[in-house]
Curated annotation (Swiss-Prot):
GO terms for molecular function: metal ion binding; rhamnulose-1-phosphate aldolase activity. Zn(2+) binds at residues 141, 143, 212. Homotetramer. GO terms for cellular component: cytosol. The active site is at 117. This is Rhamnulose-1-phosphate aldolase. Coiled coil: none annotated. Belongs to the aldolase class II family. RhaD subfamily.
């Protein structure tokens, strides 16, 4: 019999959560991660499912996600512990046929529940499914240190933060040409912040929560982790630049345009036109 803990999706979640903790992005129970699956991914492991799956209603119906399975991190769970006990810290859930709630098929033992940011994740999944024609499958939220730091010293403006991150490392424009959305500060774990995040996810694969963290979306766990890692590396460079007195020279507008042409991407127009 196949064991679900050996599946590609459980092993992928173990690696992503462990790597994020080692990066320092997910202290204590900070951060959350969800991966949209297909029925064919989970079907071979039906023997591992709970005999009586718990049902939890969603705070608002999400018919676009009807009958869709996900693997999710748990509420109050520490990323550093996922590798030690996947079944206690992760869960496979499946949305019901009308999108009103979900059953916990596997994991989240001892009456654990999915992350408190599940509304933000599911709403963002809906928008990224539409924006990428189903290509994006991962939503990752973490407390990337230097990205958070920048929200204290830069104007919280999409065009400005995007432009500065592009300048912080040449690869950034290629990796996230659609730029970085940013919200006003909001109380986490609410439908309101979930809706605001999803609205930005219509246009951007990265969304900053000022003084809190970042949301990233991508087609795979590796791509999504790499997206956040790239932005965070640029933010680290910028933090060092500002601590050394600021930029003396940088990548110019003309050079950014040339970079986009070379790699066949269309940079966010408002960030290119900023100066």
């Amino acid at each position: 019999m196949q064991n679900i803990t050996d599946s590609w999706f459980v092993q992928g979640m173990i690696k992503a959560t462990s790597d994020a903790w080692l990066k320092g992005w997910d202290e204590r129970n900070g951060g959350n991660l969800t991966l949209r699956l297909d029925e064919t991914d989970i079907a071979p492991f039906a023997a591992n499912f709970h005999e009586k799956p718990r049902y939890i209603a969603l705070s608002q119906p999400m018919p676009l996600l009807a009958n869709t399975p996900f693997i999710v991190t748990g509420s109050g769970k520490f990323f550093r512990n996922v590798q030690l006990d996947p079944a206690a810290n992760l869960g496979v859930v499946k949305i019901d046929s009308d999108g009103a709630g979900y059953h916990i098929l596997w994991g989240l033992t001892h009456d654990a529940v999915p992350t408190s940011e599940l509304p933000a994740h599911f709403l963002s999944h809906c928008e990224r499914i539409k924006a990428t024609h189903g290509k994006d499958r991962v939503i990752m939220h973490c407390h990337a240190t230097n990205l958070i730091a920048l929200t204290y010293v830069l104007e919280n403006n999409t065009a400005l933060i995007t432009r500065k991150l592009w300048e912080g490392s040449t690869e950034c424009l290629v990796v996230f040409p659609d730029g970085v959305g940013i919200l006003p500060w909001m109380v986490p774990g609410t439908d309101e912040i979930g809706q605001a995040t999803a609205q930005e996810m219509q246009k951007h694969s990265l969304v900053l929560w000022p003084f809190h963290g970042v949301f990233g979306s991508g087609p795979t766990l590796d791509e999504t982790f790499g997206l956040i890692d790239t932005a965070e590396k640029s933010a680290e460079v910028l933090v060092k630049i500002y601590s050394m007195g600021g930029m003396k020279q940088t990548i110019t507008r003309e050079e950014l345009v040339a970079l986009g042409k070379r790699f066949g991407v269309t940079p966010l127009a408002s960030a290119v036109a900023l100066y």
